[in-house]
Amino acid sequence: GRFHYGRRGSPTQWALAEALTELEPGADGTMLYPSGTAALAGALMSVLEPGDVLLVQDNVYEPTRSIGSSLLRRWGVETRFFDPEDFEAYAGMFDDRVKAVMLEVPGSLTMEVCDVPRLAGIAKEHGATVLIDNTWATGLGFPALEHGCDITITSLTKHAGGHSDLLMGCASAGKAHYAKLRHTAQLLGQYVSPDDAA
């Protein structure tokens, strides 16, 4: 069952995750994390292995850049940054090692809006998983899973909390990727307090 061990989820954690899944069109499940940055790291770690290449939009949230250029690099994952407006150059970056693309809309620092369906479509042509930091728009403003993304990540600190009384993040995905998110989170002990989820 779902309640056989605390780190596997409590009634409040499951209730929040299920509510967030309902707000994310196309999602089969949502994982909760202790922060938005933890959600970013956990999601990326669920789809990447040593030797892989990650393509990252060049105007993403600074911690996302750092996860790619430091943490993932130490694990043998190469990160390459791209201009989301230069589709030809972006398409030219793909090779057999590129396994994932990290998008963000709008860009955290610049509020630039990119053509997510087009970028995701190019990634899909090359068999890459598409992740998006959808914190500003959320699934209510931009249903990313319906526009070609595989995993959508949100900092709940900003929207679910917003009053400096909650620190949390989430990642939502379809069935196959949700299973990977859940497995990786369990191995890393990435969970939130049942009280915070209430």
Give the location of each predicted region:
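Conserved N-terminal alpha-helix of the aminotransferase class I/II PLP-enzyme fold
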Residues: 1-38, 64, 68-70
